[in-house]
Amino acid sequence: MLKPSINELLTVVDSRYSLVVATAKRARQIIDGAKIKVDSDSNKPVSTAAKEIYEGKVTYIKTDEDER
C-alpha cells in the first residue's frame, strides 16, 4: 500500500494526472541515480518519489502542454 495515500497526495498536487506524471518522472530520476531527498524505509522508487512529493521536497511545473 502506498504511503502517503492517494488522498493525502492529492492535497499537495492539483490532479490525479499531475500526481501520476510527477511521481513517474521522479521515480525514473531515482532509478537513474538521483539523490533521494527524504528518509524512506522503502526501497521502491515510486514510494520514495510519492513521499518526496508529499513532503514538498520535489515540485513540478505545469506547462502549456499539460493543459491540453
UniProtKB/Swiss-Prot annotation:
The lineage of its organism: Bacteria, Bacillati, Bacillota, Clostridia, Peptostreptococcales. Its EC number is 2.7.7.6. GO terms for biological process: DNA-templated transcription. GO terms for cellular component: DNA-directed RNA polymerase complex. It catalyses: RNA(n) + a ribonucleoside 5'-triphosphate = RNA(n+1) + diphosphate. InterPro entries: DNA-dir_RNA_pol_omega, Pol_omega/Rpo6/RPB6, RPB6/omega-like_sf. Keywords: DNA-directed RNA polymerase, Nucleotidyltransferase, Transcription, Transferase. The keyword RNA-binding does not apply. It comes from the Bacteria. The gene is rpoZ. Promotes RNA polymerase assembly. Latches the N- and C-terminal regions of the beta' subunit thereby facilitating its interaction with the beta and alpha subunits. This is DNA-directed RNA polymerase subunit omega. GO terms for molecular function: DNA binding; DNA-directed RNA polymerase activity. The RNAP catalytic core consists of 2 alpha, 1 beta, 1 beta' and 1 omega subunit. When a sigma factor is associated with the core the holoenzyme is formed, which can initiate transcription. Belongs to the RNA polymerase subunit omega family.
